[in-house]
Amino acid sequence: MIMNTRPIIGITMGDPAGNGPEITVKALAHKELYENCRPIVIGDAKILEQAVRFVGRPDIRIHRCETVGDGLFTYGTVDVLHLELIPDVESFPIGEVSVAGGNAAFQCVKKVIQLALANEVDATCTNALNKEAMNRALEFYKGEYSDGHTHFDGHTEIYAAYTNTEKYTMMLAHHDLRVVHISTHVSLREACDRVKKERVLEVIEIADKACKDMGIENPKVAVAGLNPHCGENGLFGTEEIKPAIEMAKARGIQAIGPIPPDSVFSEALGGWYDIVVCMYHDQGHIPLKTVGFVYDRELQEWKAVEGVNVTLGLPIIRTSVDHGTGFALAGT
């Protein structure tokens, strides 16, 4: 890792048609951030200059960099490792799915992974990309700019592919609630089929290690059930969750469950568990976003959109926002 008291954080700009560039400018407008790290945005400098105008911050200057070493890392200046992705920013459609936007977002992710693997940045943080736009681009260019890849389910799978990682999972966190997933971006039918003993054990082990890496000693790993009431003690359901839990216990992990999904998250919020292993995407996303996303009924707008996405199991650090591209909000 790079030896410095302030780590270098590579931040992707996200889909240029979304609100990622604007969110980035707003985030980097906080002076205290520069006291803790050295951020550098990976993207098209012209898009970030446009974002500065959108958010009304003429006091912020965009500094184009050819290498990470060119960064000034000074408050009031946003360093951008420039990639020429959108030739004509003025004619680029904001708030729409496009091949150009999808390709731009993908190239930023690919580049930041390369930088992390080369130890040029200490950690990575990704803004949202639009999966439809990205996959349109991958298919349109027939893998020419993606090392032959013509489809990715999302960020997690891109990181796994470009770091040659086989065992990984997504963790969402909001204060004391942490959730990890057996599967993510697949249909519910397929998600049920993926609940296998080997995969459940794998994710329990990843979750246990992640908690220990975060400084939690002897973490309590809750494992959610799949069927209502966890199958009523065997009356129905044939998933292999319980055997995986027993195997994890035999390996010294404090795994607990299976626990009914309608109560495990409240218990985790109350401090009973340090992390919850969820059987599929929405089982983990819904409770976390229920506590992290707050909608103001009177103002008819989001009051808070909080949560951090972390990919576990990678050889590099990857964090992300826990929301989408916000096409409807871009440029406003």
Task: Label the predicted regions.
Residues 156:
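Active-site-proximal region of nucleotide-activated glycan assembly enzymes
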Residues 2-152, 194, 200-279, 283-309, ...:
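Contiguous, glycine/small-aliphatic-enriched amphipathic segments in soluble metabolic enzymes
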Residues 164, 172-194, 198-201:
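Ligand-binding beta-strand-loop-alpha-helix segment within the catalytic cores
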Residues 159-168, 173-177, 312-328:
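Short, flexible loop segments at boundaries between secondary-structure elements
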